[in-house]
Amino acid sequence: MNILILSRNSRLYSTRRLVEAGRERGHQVRVVDPLRCYMNISPHKPEIHYKGETLENFDGVIPRIGASITFYGTAVLRQFEIMGTFPLNESVAISRSRDKLRSTQLLARKGIGLPMTTFGYSPDDTEDLINLVGGPPMVIKLLEGTQGKGVVLAETQQAAESLIDAFRGLNVHFLAQEYIKEAGGSDIRCFVVGERVVASMRRQAKEGEFRSNIHRGGQASTVRITPEERSMAVRAARIMGLNVAGVDLIRSAHGSLVLEVNSSPGLEGIEKATGKDIAGTIYAFLEKNARQGKTRTRGRG
């Protein structure tokens, strides 16, 4: 197959592994920077151009689109979909999962277990928002954050109110969420490919930190997940409409809960922790499913 990877940095571990794994399996693989792509939006012959050449005749496209370029990156991916190129994850599914509020509402609608979460606008409702999640300690998440950035632990009522006031003063939206103290700063990343959990790892926050993200110094190790957790991860990815997803779970006193569904999960932590060839598994999915024009909107809302 002829595969295109949309990535701003070909030296990143995940991008390198996807190139290596594809070529090892006999595929032609090319990496292009989505921000250098530009489009001819035509009803008769839609095109994508890159540094003066036309990009065409690809069997599949693998989006590795960072959160900061979601708008433009998904526009480029959508243009490939219009041209009939099979996307590993569809543009609409990526946009859906990147919106923390929208994705939380959709997961809740389908009965997926979540930490108690509130969202509001008026300063008059701040105290009620805090009380609805059980009071401090509590987590406040910026809707635009990624890799643990914009996620703050408020340990007291005064800290919670001050943080909420500060975020409102900056005119940014946020979620207030219960803090799962019994998790001890750990969560579980389930890597879903084609409605199967193909690998899972435990991420443990470094001492003095409650965020377990690998980018923030968290340590990865192998973990055995339960059948219920496996089913929950697959369902969460399906609700988002994602073929490939990193579903983050946290174990609470009242069962496992979904923290987030990531549409562009990194490969380094989970491949090194588990020893599994996740990049190869992604290509196995593409080999089975990538067909010209086989683009359809998955998920709802």
UniProtKB/Swiss-Prot annotation:
Keywords tagged on the record: ATP-binding, Ligase, Magnesium, Manganese, Metal-binding, Nucleotide-binding, Protein biosynthesis
Positions of Mn(2+) 1 binding: 248, 260
Any one cellular-component term (Gene Ontology): cytoplasm
Cofactor(s) required for function per UniProt: Mg(2+); Mn(2+)
PANTHER family, per the entry: RIBOSOMAL PROTEIN BS6--L-GLUTAMATE LIGASE, RIBOSOMAL PROTEIN S6 MODIFICATION PROTEIN
Cofactor note: Binds 2 magnesium or manganese ions per subunit.
Source superkingdom: Bacteria
Binding site for ATP: 141, 178-179, 187, 211-213
Protein name: Probable alpha-L-glutamate ligase
InterPro entries: ATP-grasp, ATP-grasp_RimK-type, ATP_grasp_subdomain_1, RimK, Rimk_N, Rp_bS6_RimK/Lys_biosynth_LsyX
Pfam family, one: RimK
Primary gene name: rimK
Assigned EC number: 6.3.2.-
Annotated binding of Mn(2+) 2, by residue: 260, 262
Example GO molecular function: metal ion binding
BP GO terms, sorted: protein modification process; SOS response; translation
Protein's organism: Alkalilimnicola ehrlichii (strain ATCC BAA-1101 / DSM 17681 / MLHE-1)
Positions of Mg(2+) 2 binding: 260, 262
Stated family: Belongs to the RimK family.
Keyword Metal-binding appears in the UniProt entry: yes
Lineage: Bacteria, Pseudomonadati, Pseudomonadota, Gammaproteobacteria, Chromatiales
Covalent S-S links between cysteines: none
Domain ATP-grasp: 104-287
Positions contributing to Mg(2+) 1 binding: 248, 260
Key word DNA-binding present: no
